[in-house]
UniProtKB/Swiss-Prot annotation:
It comes from the Bacteria. Monomer. Binds 1 dipyrromethane group covalently. Pfam families: Porphobil_deam (PF01379), Porphobil_deamC (PF03900). This is Porphobilinogen deaminase. It catalyses: 4 porphobilinogen + H2O = hydroxymethylbilane + 4 NH4(+). One of its GO terms (biological process) is protoporphyrinogen IX biosynthetic process. Its EC number is 2.5.1.61. Keywords: Porphyrin biosynthesis, Transferase. Tetrapolymerization of the monopyrrole PBG into the hydroxymethylbilane pre-uroporphyrinogen in several discrete steps. InterPro entries: HemC, Porphobilin_deaminase_cofac_BS, Porphobilin_deaminase_N, Porphobilinogen_deaminase_C, Porphobilinogen_deaminase_C_sf. It comes from Desulfitobacterium hafniense (strain Y51). The modification S-(dipyrrolylmethanemethyl)cysteine is found at C240. GO terms for cellular component: cytoplasm.
Amino acid sequence: MGSVKIGTRDSQLALWQAEWVKRKLEEYYPEREFVLVPMKTKGDKILDVPLAKIGDKGLFTKELEVGLLNGEIDCAVHSLKDLPTVLPPGLEIAAFCEREEPRDVFLSKDGTPLGSLPAGSIIGTSSLRRKAQLQNYRSDLSFADLRGNLQTRWRKLQESDMAGIVLAAAGVKRLGWEDRITEYISEEIMLSAVGQGAIAVEIAAQRADVREMLDLLNHGDTERAVKAERALLYRLEGGCQIPIGAWAVTEQQQIVLKGMVASLDGQRILKVTLSGEHPEELGRQAADLLIAQGALEILQEIRTPLEK
């Protein structure tokens, strides 16, 4: 058998994640050769437009998925939060790796935490989810769109009049930047994106050999938690550029799921907390409770201008 080709985006963080998967596989299968195949995705190439305006189906995944379907690569490593809830026909997730810290973090230019920033301070983020929740927490803040990899965002913070930037804790920790974190943002203030902090490995469905190999990387508690979150997102027909947050944790047999839908200005935030044993069912039930509070109306208001 030849080498196993692992597809990945070519950013430093994506390469870290793919290298982590590669090292794990080398530990389990020392007799096999594993090689990384870096690729650029559409989302990596278009950096001057906010994500919400590009549309988000497979923005950071499509090129890798084409590689899976045409046999160019054997598996693809993704940040789970970038993977749409509906995968292209013929593809599946073979492993949900153990989740890193799912919260968001604030990196302040001068060490001032979010709650103490002066009115009018500018926060760098392109995420509608982060903006909406921050506006709900502090309506006196301003925002600047911020795209690019983590190194680019950090550089832009230093070179601009932004007071700070909001990033996913997992990526910051994986790059060894813990000393740059001013604070971890409480989930009471900011619920994270669906699947945030988890690495997923995608394969072509007919590749039973690769599925079996990746089974050792799958983390059961992470799988159950993120499946509940993804079921909520699917039921709400949300994409990763819509202000929907979810965070599930497993406690013995139970899964506790928190869900959130926000209006763009953060004036309306709907929340739900629900527990159950079955991930997909729990996600659907939590979404239905949000729908009963008016979630679909909020989401339609957001989608209409984005679709024009």
